[in-house]
Amino acid sequence: MTKQEKAINLSESAQVDQQSVQPFPRSRKVYVEGSRPDIRVPMREISLDDTPTDFGGESNAPVLVYDTSGPYTDPDVIIDVRKGLPDVRSAWIEARGDTERLEGLSSDFGQQRLNDAELAKLRFAHVRNPRRAKAGANVSQMHYARQGIITAEMEYVAIRENMKLQEARAAGLLNEQHAGHSFGANIPKEITPEFVRQEIARGRAIIPANINHPEVEPMIIGRNFLVKINGNIGNSALGSSIEEEVAKLTWGIRWGSDTVMDLSTGKHIHETREWIIRNSPVPIGTVPIYQALEKVNGVAEDLTWELFRDTLIEQAEQGVDYFTIHAGVLLRYVPLTAKRVTGIVSRGGSIMAKWCLAHHKENFLYTHFDEICEIMKAYDVSFSLGDGLRPGSIADANDAAQFGELETLGELTKIAWKHDVQCMIEGPGHVPMQLIKENMDKQLECCDEAPFYTLGPLTTDIAPGYDHITSGIGAAMIGWFGCAMLCYVTPKEHLGLPNKDDVKTGIITYKIAAHAADLAKGHPGAQIRDNALSKARFEFRWEDQFNLGLDPDTARAFHDETLPKESAKVAHFCSMCGPKFCSMKITQEVREYAAKIEAVDVTVEQGMREQAERFRQEGSQLYHKV
């Protein structure tokens, strides 16, 4: 530890990022209660102004939106990152009676870190003893689902996905939505707990929720549910502190990150992860091989199954919800990458490829896969089967190495399912638009509809600094085709470690992609927010336009750059067209004129009817004597 690190006592000094705890404008946190009082599902309600009288003068109902920000945006909750978030799930877990509280950490490395006095100032102070399944028990959500059990987590996500659709339907808000094309997905009109159970039992969806992460607000990943996004954080050997990573977490979930992966490769990985999990209301994923490699000083050849196994247990007992495991990088596939333009670009994939070649043995993650499953089901950690041979350039898309690994991931999925372990599949990468659907179709075929989770894909390689856009295009497409979760890409992709601003930009870009996919699939209620914003735009309700958007702050700032006065917030124009050429304003004038013409037409028509009646009463004579 450096002198500066020794001087910092995080258990005394750590503070929440103040930007992350500000409520959104005109929004309030609401909770929908389930069948028991401790099932309280958070949503964000956006209040709207009334329609101005010159537009008809009507009230506008509040709009509910999916909320990933956890307690951070609830003004009634006092946030102290030194103590972690409120417990959501412990009562549910204890009631099932199939877990036990351990006397202490069971991983060698975890015990070693705990006994290192020098780390005391960096360590999260309020660590619980971990839970584990009782001997012979399986505590995965898939196992419960296959036993016909609807867990509290399943009911929670059903309420969360449903977003009070029944009320919206009764109000007629679902009538104004285009029909979608879902490419074979089976999206019901209402998400019920039983439907959630069926999807998890079938393997088409997962609820990543480790029994040692009781702070998590359950969410679901699957093609028949809302498209989700993941944001990456994590330190590197070149920088970032524990506080900075926790700030990135809280910042990311504020803007809509459904899950977060901690990809730390620098110092204090164990301690950083503990702070992140204890303060995260969303599932946390990791790539355990990264930390295992740090334990052998970066020498891939020195990795062993025993070391990796201890790392899995260490992270599972901290509460990691899903592991990226690169078990599909087989020895026979490595030569297939030799003629690629960019070779193997996955860090985990390259680590395992190097190990295989150095020992001329099969990937130990593959040969020990059943043993990995035994660990996963003891803590309910979900698999995210890594695509270690994903293409790193569009020239390498859809090649033999990529699809060979995908077929192996399909085999491993079936093994995981035999253990009742939840599983999703990671995908590319760099893929031109015309080849994206082939990726989705092949994944559905090989992996029997297990959820697909892709990095983009990037649709062109010519835009360093703008790869959030090149990948957002591919993400929207593959989300429409059936991808369940999209891993964000920031503007710093290929260039450097993202900061807070980059994290926000990446998340907003991917929220756009995911929402566009939901619209295209015809997900019930997906268009409600669009319709509300469009109506506000037409009625020049500027504040409502800002607040209904994914990023109210940026929308308001852009508007105020040229029209900063408060009076501009009620003006019937913006600086793009000015008062004379605003198409919305002109349309309103056309409507008013048409209404007047229509009124004149009605008067003329009424007069003509009266004259016709008089003509008949007078005998229908064309001429009368004077």
Swiss-Prot record:
Cofactor binding note of this UniProt entry: Binds 1 [4Fe-4S] cluster per subunit. The cluster is coordinated with 3 cysteines and an exchangeable S-adenosyl-L-methionine.
GO MF annotation: an example: 4 iron, 4 sulfur cluster binding
Positions contributing to Zn(2+) binding: H430, H494
Record-linked PANTHER family: PHOSPHOMETHYLPYRIMIDINE SYNTHASE, CHLOROPLASTIC, THIAMINE BIOSYNTHESIS PROTEIN THIC
Biological role: Catalyzes the synthesis of the hydroxymethylpyrimidine phosphate (HMP-P) moiety of thiamine from aminoimidazole ribotide (AIR) in a radical S-adenosyl-L-methionine (SAM)-dependent reaction.
Subunit structure as annotated in this protein's UniProt entry: Homodimer.
Protein name: Phosphomethylpyrimidine synthase
Organism name: Pseudomonas putida (strain ATCC 47054 / DSM 6125 / CFBP 8728 / NCIMB 11950 / KT2440)
